[in-house]
Swiss-Prot record:
Belongs to the PMP outer membrane protein family. It is found in: Secreted, Cell wall; Cell outer membrane. This is Probable outer membrane protein pmp11. Residues 627-928 form the Autotransporter domain. InterPro entries: Autotransporte_beta, Autotransporte_beta_dom_sf, Polymorphic_membr_middle, POMP_repeat. The gene is pmp11. It is a peripheral membrane protein.
């Protein structure tokens, strides 16, 4: 115990001494330390003493070295690490001229790092710019350059005559950026327009946007040049655009003269290489080994290589190099990447990837529900004996790679389609399809040393596409031919070169409907003969072509449940002179089954909308004409209707909404008969619960007549021949008031319907609906001798109403559209109910409430016959069938503003078992 005390004291002294030394090497930077060469009269003296600079506020250094270059970097450390702590503040360097030194900061000792951490803004702008002809970039380190936990980073307009236009280090780290990290318009007279490293770069775990824009290198790596293994991973947004290199790697170059560095790009939520340019190879990336796996949207777009012998429009792999592409959690797309041959008048050729001499693919795979799209071809040089297993998973485990590898000429222009190289992809190694799908579309050719297919995978090919081998056989166990492409009248081609090489096709011959709607195509509206499959070998077709295990009847995938129905038959022919065996397919049409989208009944259901509108107009005129305070005059009212019909297993639901205005007039005769006329203009919208909607305009009119009469049963009995005692006659009422009303209405509707099919072109159709309606009603008003507090008059009512609506025939405008025959709706109903009225003549405010039970005693439901525009196939379409019993509740209120003006409102609700209808009217009347 005694001997331990001195050692404790010694350790404490040493630790305290080290702490004091650390404090001595830390310097605070405050806003007072800022420098502006345009304002400050003195000169800036480079700082070289501290190893750590900690900011206490926002600091800037603007144009130090103006007029006379600085003797060294603004900050320099020659023996230790150099660290800047932002503490949430900003640090800005602008227009620095440090002569032959790095403009902002440098750490010159091997394995000692230059680190910036914790800034709200870190900016290096033109420090130095290209006007400093001896510039050496803005940051330099013999160890690593680390940029950590920075909210916003700007590295722009910097220049170096050496490597790394902005940043040069043994390594580079960018991590923890939460805002925007921008590297733009930096340039190097050698390599690495923005960044150059000898031991690799790591750009990882940035939750903001990392962008490299318009950086230029005079040799390689327009944005980044690395000679060591580099990792770009787990970034939210990584974007390279407009970068350029005079030799290789328009955006990134990752090679070393001696050694095999690897570039690993993985799990970036968005990764885009766009419009980058190189003059030798790799418009976007040139690497010895590249492993690219998607973490989201990944795209190579419009990258270009321009030289006498350009290679790799988007990606170039060095000789004996390796490439792995894996679509893990997002698609990977190569589109419009090109090669331009200088000195040639030919248009640029499409190219996605070039594999250098004796290089190889190690992985080409896509996880389930993801795709690698090659709209530009792949080229390969030399040979490799290693088998490329497309969509290959780990041995002994469930294969997760059941996605799609797609080669397509879909995006080629008409001129580009004339160039065979734009359609041909080549692998100079054996290829095996282990899982998922390999699709060849739009005229492409895929060439490999040999080709084989494992169970559970699908090789899908368009008519006019080719699968060929240069030195091996073709073995296919599950071939699918895209039915949509059969109209080209060109066969799918399988070609095996070499006298002893075979083509073996077994299993199902699938006719694939990729879009799921091909049998809607008019190509199948009649019997057809298609060229299906052509197999070519170099010798002895009878021996080297084996289709003995191929199921002779083609299988539809998926089955054609809707569209044109028919049967497929395949016939084979053999030509020994050309060593070919060819299959033709015969389609025999048997019928047509419309899809649910084509069976949309909205056209028929617009008749129910007209039915609703004309009845609402009649109710408005009836209620408005017979109200307590309604005397002769002119009136105007708004009118709004809403009808909703729920669907069932046989018919889809729909809804109708309309609104507009009504103008009318009322007059009384000397005998107190009432005449009312009205005109309406409505705007309506009908929509089914599917894909169609209709807009319409309705013009309508109505004429209402009401005759009031009082029966006197006692006088009739006294004057009649029947002999009643006076006491018996006195038991009858002295007077019985009656009211008989008659109403006739008409309307015309102009309709314009749009149908937005999920897989067919949009179609439009226009037609008109005509409507005639009428009704007869009988009222028996009673004034209660003991009035209820809520109403004074009770009026039993009974009506007979008829509505007839006709829909004219028409055809939709598109070739995929339909024609509709004439449709009709006829409905005869008998409403029975009563009205309760509160108010007397002379009252300024009155209201009433009515309730009816409505029975539709006769109905002809709307229906029509639909016919395809391009063929005579037709089917019945039946409109909605509203319940035949309804409860109708109506109310109105009237307010006499003065002797010449009256305000009124009407409300109605009709409830049926499968529908509901609401109506609201608000208006005013000028009386005279």
């Amino acid at each position: 115990m005694k001997t331990s005390i001195p050692w404790v004291l010694v350790s404490s002294v040493l630790a305290f001494s080290c702490h004091l030394q650390s404090l001595a090497n830390e310097e605070l930077l405050s806003p007072d330390d800022s420098f502006n060469g345009n304002i400050d009269s003195g000169t800036f003296t480079p700082k070289t003493s501290a190893t750590t600079y900690s900011l206490t506020g926002d600091v800037f250094f603007y144009e130090p070295g103006k007029g006379t270059p600085l003797s060294d970097s603004c900050f320099k450390q020659t023996t230790d690490n150099l660290t800047f702590l932002g503490n949430g503040h900003s640090l800005t360097f602008g227009f620095i001229d440090a002569g032959t030194h790095a403009g902002a900061a440098a750490s010159t000792t091997a394995n000692k790092n230059l680190t910036f951490s914790g800034f709200s803004l870190l900016s290096f702008d033109s420090s130095p710019s290209t006007t400093v002809t001896t510039g050496q970039g803005t940051l330099s380190s013999a160890g690593g350059v680390n940029l950590e936990n920075i909210r916003k980073l700007v590295v722009a307009g910097n220049f170096s005559t050496a490597d790394g236009g902005a940043i040069k280090g043994a390594s580079f780290l960018l991590t923890g950026t939460s805002g925007d990290a921008l590297f733009s318009n930096n340039s190097s007279s050698t390599k690495g327009g923005a960044i150059a490293t000898t031991a690799g770069a790591r750009i990882a775990n940035n939750t903001g946007y990392v962008r490299f824009l318009s950086n230029i290198a005079s040799t390689s790596g327009g944005a980044i040049d690395d000679e060591g293994t580099s990792i770009l991973s787990n970034n939210k947004f990584l974007y390279f655009e407009g970068n350029a290199a005079k030799t290789t790697g328009g955006a990134i170059c990752n090679t070393k003269a001696s050694g095999s560095p690897e570039l690993i790009i993985s799990n970036n939520k968005t990764l885009i290489f766009a419009s980058n340019v190189a003059e030798t190879s790799g418009g976007a990336i040139h690497a010895k080994k590249l492993a690219l796996s998607s973490g989201g949207f990944t795209e190579f777009l419009r990258n270009n290589v321009s030289s006498a012998t350009p290679k790799g429009g988007a990606i170039s792999i060095d000789a004996s190099g390796e490439l792995s592409l894996s679509a893990e959690t997002g698609n990977i797309t190569f589109v419009r990447n090109t090669l331009t041959t200088t000195g040639s008048t030919d248009t640029p050729k499409r190219n996605a990837i070039n594999i250098g001499s004796n290089g190889k693919f190690t992985e080409l795979r896509a996880a389930k529900n993801h795709t690698i799209f090659f709209y530009d071809p792949i080229t390969s040089e030399g040979t490799s004996s290693d088998v490329l297993k497309i969509n290959n998973g780990s041995a002994g485990a469930l294969n997760p790679y059941q996605g799609t590898i797609l080669f397509s000429g879909e995006t080629l222009t008409a001129d580009e389609l004339k160039v065979a190289d734009n359609l041909k992809s080549s692998f100079t190694q054996p290829v095996s399809l282990s899982g998922g799908k390999l699709l060849l579309q739009k005229g492409v050719t895929l060439e490999s040393t040999s080709f084989s297919q494992e169970a559970g995978s699908l090789l899908g090919m368009d008519s006019g596409t080719t699968l060929s081998t240069t030195a091996g056989s073709i073995t296919i166990t599950n071939l699918g031919i895209n039915v949509d492409s059969l109209g080209l009248k060109q066969p799918v081609s399988l070609t095996a070169k070499g006298a002893s090489n075979k083509v073996i096709v077994s299993g199902k011959l699938n006719l694939i409907d990729i879009e799921g709607n091909i049998y809607e195509s008019h190509m199948f509206s009649h019997d057809q003969l298609f060229s299906l499959l052509k197999i070519t070998v170099d010798a002895d077709v009878d021996t080297n072509v084996d289709i003995s295990s191929l199921i002779p009847v083609p299988a539809e995938d998926p089955n054609s449940e809707y569209g044109f129905q028919g049967q497929w038959n395949v016939n084979w022919t053999t030509d020994t002179a050309t060593n070919t065996k060819e299959a033709t397919a015969t389609w025999t049409k048997t019928g047509f089954v419309p899809s649910p989208e084509r069976k949309s009944a909205l056209v028929c259901n617009t008749l129910w909308g007209v039915f609703t509108d004309i009845r609402s107009l009649q109710q408005l005129v009836e209620i408005g004409a017979t109200g307590m305070e309604h005397k002769q005059g002119f009136w105007v009212s708004s009118m709004t209707n809403f009808l909703h019909k729920t669907g069932d297993e046989n018919r889809k639901g729909f809804r109708h909404t309309s609104g507009g205005y009504v103008i009318g007039g009322s007059a009384h005769t000397p005998k107190d008969d009432l005449f009312t006329f009205a005109f309406c203009h409505l705007f309506a919208r009908d929509k089914d619960c599917f894909i169609a909607h209709n807009n319409s305009r309705t013009y309508g009119g109505t004429l209402f007549f009401k005759h009031s009469h009082t029966l006197q049963p006692q006088n009739y009995l006294r004057l009649g021949r029947a002999k009643f005692s006076e006491s018996a006659i006195e038991k009858f009422p002295r007077e019985i008031p009656l009211a008989l009303d008659v109403q006739v209405s008409f309307s015309h509707s102009d309709n314009r319907m749009e149908t937005h099919y999920t897989s067919l072109p949009e179609s439009e159709g226009s037609w008109s609906n005509e409507c005639i309606a009428g009704g007869i009603g009988l009222d028996l008003p009673f004034v209660l001798s003991n009035p209820h507090p809520l109403f004074k008059t009770f009026i039993p009512q009974m009506k007979v109403e008829m509505v007839y609506v006709s829909q004219n025939s028409f055809f939709e405008s598109s070739s995929d559209g339909r024609g509709f025959s004439i449709g009709r709706l006829l409905n005869l109903s008998i409403p029975v109910g009563a009205k309760f009225v509160q108010g007397d003549i002379g009252d300024s405010y009155t209201y009433d409430l009515s309730g009816f039970f409505v029975s539709d005693v006769y109905r002809n439901n709307p229906q029509s016959t639909a016919t395809l525009v391009m063929s005579p196939d037709s089917w019945k379409i039946r409109g909605g069938n509203l319940s035949r019993q309804a409860f109708l509740l109506r109310g109105s209120n009237n307010y006499v503003y003065n002797s010449n003006c009256e305000l009124f409102g009407h409300y109605a609700m009709e409830l049926r078992g499968s529908s509901r209808n609401y109506n609201v009217d608000v208006g005013t009347k000028l009386r005279f």
